[in-house]
């Protein structure tokens, strides 16, 4: 018995030592700093990337004046709302990263605060919860 306790305590001590790893710097989920630099280079040199960049910024600009999302369940699903939330977080995050304009970050924060006030994210349909969680993670990152 003593041997098992010693092995367990040794394992726990070693785990604690290695658990002190440095946290990753934000952003790291989708577009890290290296990816951002590569995208900026592509935008500067290729028309297709310039067109896509413009389209993304137009999408983000349209969100700035759109009403906040409401918790409207269609049938048994909140999927349209959760997918729109995910779309908004992706566009606003991209626009903020590429332009550094604070209004995109403020709107993303407003959207996240808004959906956090929903009664729930429709747990009976796991995909609704998964997409809302993904949107929140991307917005936070």
Predicted segment positions?
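N-terminal intrinsically disordered, low-complexity tails enriched in polar/charged
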Residues: 21-29
